[in-house]
């Protein structure tokens, strides 16, 4: 990042950067003389006039040729609906990308309103990214929605038509999520082959931009930013003409809907028109939005390459709800209809045409044929599984542990407003979410950015951290990827920091003399277990006989919501929970697989130190990767110290809030922070 500062602000800026553990250097000065000069080792290597820079160089001209084009509809192979459905679901532009998506943290910031995949089974792909605006204090219902549109098979035939429809598709997806298209703006990502001097090559971006411009004028929506590249050529290979439209709009979390079917017995309707008939299209947008706001439409899907058939399958897969198509529906199930919307309605409203009804079985019933969609799901999920795997162990249950506490320890000193110390190491990214969770529970939070730019800075950070722990009642190690999880594993810098004698003494004083609490989430849990604070309650030299957290069994990062069961409420952190309570919790980690000797695990279970376990939809502890994302032994998600005051867990319990994760069912708030605050208040 580069910044231009007034001379009197430079020292303050450098000091602020240092407090955030950032390197900042003065690299240039603005002068009155209108020339750009650069020197290297005392030698001037650049000396250009401002007037020359403002000219942008010499004028250039080229010729663009746009041939007549004719877009042919995409045809899926097969003579029967079953054959076409199988071909469609195996198409690279339609098949599941879940294994790719789960490599990216989708819940950071505790503001995600719609998860990338929704429904009970988290399998319906969400078409619109929706998140609350970030606020450090308080709550908000204000969200932003973002959706994209792009079809390379159309762009390759007609850059103009492909770009026009990209805009239409991106806006239609916003409407299907409950956003008003009249408040939307656009941004474009463009990528074309190297132009050279060929007029037909220049004609492709020319036609694409005309198509996008016409769509903007028709919808009265402006593009306010974008990025382009014309370097998509390698030797004799060229990228297809590419213009991806992103539509963005503000809205309210309470008015957002998600695309997964909600219940059997609802009617399914199709609203469509010629996408170039702007009056009809915008009338459809207004009518659908009105029905969504009235609660008559509970899920909606913007049709794409796979048409109605793709929409029915993807809307149904999240909750395994099938479709019975009406006998009198005569539409083409596989026709691409950009701008069309498939609606799940709670009542038979006068909007578009009726396609059919939702049914409780995971099937598609059409013209007397009953298609088992489980086999189709295998095609859909399996296409890219060898490239972006997200499937592993299935169906294996494991032992459930249970330990119910009847009484809880009392802190040595009652505190009216308990203070949590939250250290931020290089790579930590959850400190704001964690501090907000503490404050929402009635406590106070104090954040310290650990500075490791110099040896002296590390010494100062240790001294300051020790002082802050001395006045705190809790230590919370937030999640992230400290040190980039290098070298060869997570939390090494955190553990080295806490093994410093001053830090070790401060932690032991908090836990052993003042009866304080300590929590480690994700990266923080990794630090706690490598320090020995869990399961032993103190910082020790660990050995290969100690439990640890290692790389996920699937061999990559996992991000999703999981179900965890309270196995023991012995910890003050879990005093407001009951054994067998189940919560839906966000996870995001690459090293979360708990392993340890069986004898030790049995000992921990007997002492009530196994706090939480991953469970399936039936509440059974499981090794199934759909529910146990890292392959943890005995499905263990969290453990505690012997007295329960220290707890470590992989799930991001701090990532909760009103209106979040609306497309995945389940109770998300474990009230861990409320439990800790009440314990320290002796309530």
Task: Identify the role of each PLM range.
Residues 197, 487-495, 612-613, 619-624:
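Short, basic, glycine/proline-bearing loop/turn elements
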Residues 229, 482, 524-526, 591, ...:
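Catalytic metal-binding/acid-base residues of hydrolase active sites
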Residues 34-35, 231-233, 254, 526-530, ...:
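Short, well-ordered, mixed-charge alpha-helical segments that flank or form enzyme active sites
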Residues 478, 482-570:
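Cysteine-nucleophile active-site neighborhood
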Residues 1-484, 497-508, 639-640, 668, ...:
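Glycine/proline-enriched, intrinsically flexible loops and inter-domain linkers
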Residues 302, 522, 652:
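Active-site glycine-centered loops adjacent to acidic/histidine catalytic or metal-binding residues
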Residues 460, 465-467, 506-509, 541-683:
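Amide-donor transfer/coupling interface in amidating biosynthetic enzymes
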Residues 13, 432, 486-488, 528-531, ...:
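Short glycine-/acidic-enriched loop or helix-start segments at secondary-structure transitions
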């Amino acid at each position: 990042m580069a910044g231009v500062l007034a001379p009197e602000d430079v020292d303050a800026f450098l000091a602020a950067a240092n407090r955030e553990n950032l390197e900042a250097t003065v690299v240039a000065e603005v002068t009155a003389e209108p020339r750009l000069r650069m020197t290297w080792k005392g030698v001037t290597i650049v000396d250009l006039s401002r007037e020359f820079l403002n000219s942008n160089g010499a004028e250039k001209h080229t010729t663009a040729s746009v041939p007549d084009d004719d877009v042919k509809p995409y045809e899926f192979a097969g003579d029967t609906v079953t054959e076409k459905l199988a071909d469609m679901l195996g198409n690279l532009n339609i098949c599941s990308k879940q294994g790719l998506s789960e490599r990216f943290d989708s819940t950071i910031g505790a503001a995600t309103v719609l998860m990338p995949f929704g429904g009970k089974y988290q399998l319906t792909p969400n078409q619109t990214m929706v998140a609350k605006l970030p606020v450090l204090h308080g709550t908000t219902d204000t969200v932003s929605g973002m959706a994209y549109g792009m079809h390379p098979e159309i762009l390759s035939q007609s850059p103009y038509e492909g770009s026009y429809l990209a805009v239409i598709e991106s806006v239609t997806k916003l409407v299907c999520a409950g956003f008003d298209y009249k408040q939307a703006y656009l941004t474009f990502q463009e990528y074309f082959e190297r132009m050279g001097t060929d007029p037909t090559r220049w004609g492709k971006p020319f036609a694409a931009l005309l198509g996008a411009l016409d769509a903007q004028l028709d919808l009265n929506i402006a593009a306010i930013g974008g990025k382009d590249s014309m370097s998509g050529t390698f030797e004799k290979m060229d990228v297809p003409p590419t213009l991806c439209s992103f539509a963005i709009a503000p809205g309210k979390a309470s008015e957002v809907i998600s695309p997964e079917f909600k219940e059997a017995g609802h009617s399914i309707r199709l609203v469509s028109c010629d996408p170039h008939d702007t009056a009809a299209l915008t009338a459809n947008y207004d009518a659908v939005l009105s029905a969504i706001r009235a609660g008559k439409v509970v899920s909606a899907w913007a049709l794409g390459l796979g048409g109605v058939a793709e929409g029915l399958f993807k809307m149904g897969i999240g909750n395994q709800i099938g479709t019975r198509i009406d006998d009198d529906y005569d539409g083409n199930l596989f026709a691409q209809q950009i701008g069309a919307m498939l609606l799940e309605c709670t009542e038979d409203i006068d909007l578009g045409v009726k396609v059919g009804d939702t049914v409780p079985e995971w099937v598609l019933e059409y013209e007397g044929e009953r298609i088992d969609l489980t086999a189709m799901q295998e095609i859909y999920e399996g296409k890219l599984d060898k490239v972006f795997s997200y499937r592993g162990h299935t169906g294996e249950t494991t032992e459930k542990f249970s330990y119910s506490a009847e009484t809880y320890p009392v802190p040595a000193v009652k505190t009216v407003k308990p203070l949590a110390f939250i250290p931020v190491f290089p790579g930590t990214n959850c400190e704001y979410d964690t501090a907000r969770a503490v404050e929402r529970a009635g406590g106070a939070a104090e954040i310290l950015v650990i500075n490791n730019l110099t040896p002296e800075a590390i010494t100062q950070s240790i001294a300051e951290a020790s002082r802050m722990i001395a006045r705190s009642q809790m230590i919370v190690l937030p999640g992230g990827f400290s040190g980039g999880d290098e070298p060869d594993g997570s939390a090494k810098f955190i553990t080295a920091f806490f093994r410093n004698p001053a830090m070790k003494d401060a932690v032991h004083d908090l836990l052993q003399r003042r009866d304080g609490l300590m929590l480690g989430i994700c990266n923080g849990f990794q630090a706690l277990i490598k320090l020995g604070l869990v399961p032993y309650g103190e910082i020790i030299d660990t050995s290969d006989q100690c439990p640890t957290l290692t790389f996920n069994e699937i061999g990559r990062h996992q991000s999703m919501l999981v179900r965890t069961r309270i196995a023991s409420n012995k910890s003050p952190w879990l005093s407001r929970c009951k054994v067998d309570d189940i919560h839906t919790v966000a996870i995001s980690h690459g090293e979360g697989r708990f392993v340890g000797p069986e004898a030790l695990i049995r000992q921990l279970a007997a002492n009530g130190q196994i706090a939480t376990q991953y469970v399936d939809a039936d509440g059974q502890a499981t090794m199934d990767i759909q529910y146990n994302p890292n392959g943890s032994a005995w499905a263990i998600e969290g453990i505690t110290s012997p007295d329960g005051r220290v707890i470590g867990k992989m799930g991001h319990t701090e990532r909760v809030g009103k209106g979040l994760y609306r497309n995945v069912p389940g109770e998300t708030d474990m009230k861990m922070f409320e439990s800790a605050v009440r314990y320290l208040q002796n309530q």
